[in-house]
Amino acid sequence: MATTKLASGNLRQIAGELPRCRSVLAVCAHPDDESFGLGAVLARFEDLGSSVSVICLTHGEASTLGESAESDLAALRQAELADAAKALSLHTVRLLGYPDGTLGAEPQDRLTADVTQMAGETGADLLLVFDEGGITGHPDHMAATAAGLLAASRLGTPVLAWTLEQRVADAINSAFASTAFKGRVTGDLDVRVEVDRQRQMRAIACHKSQSFDNPVLRRRLAEQGTIEVLRWLLRR
């Protein structure tokens, strides 16, 4: 376990492994978030013996893929999510029908109730979410995280957030003018774990509509290497 000194002078312990859990529920906004973002972490939880499930709040129909009809893209991304779930060996996946792109405008009580229900059904003793800044600043990501936090606070369940090291975010933002990745300095991190990305890469390949030409994703994974970092948003 590594130790880092905070600005306050206190020492912060950075764990070198994920917490041991019976059941992990990942709360995502879009199909592909579970793979592009959380895939390696979910695979590591499974290696440690956790049952891993995902609740995805939208079908991702607002993507810029350019399908002829919005419903076609929604159906395609649903199928891609199902394939990715198999690649990641997920226990349960629930795909809801909230509108993509405006998740933050949905009644928060409804989102929270859906997450709470699935957390109860799966017996989740940990919720996994994107960091509060949504990683890319995407409002849907932030809304999904907020729903997960509210559900967890009602259930008394801890919440662990996937995030990026600040150097990774800075490198991507320097390389691509259109990006606004949010990173965290070392003093904000609680877990730094080495991962095997093989299952994640297989899951990413299932999302062909989103990964066919995605240089930003490739650059992020290259910058991360075999390391994932996380932080606690809510502890038991």
Give the positions of each predicted feature.
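Active-site rim/loop-helix segments in enzyme catalytic domains that contact anionic ligands
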Residues: M1-G123, L150-R154
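Metal-dependent de-N-acetylase/amidase catalytic core
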Residues: A2-L25, A105-R236
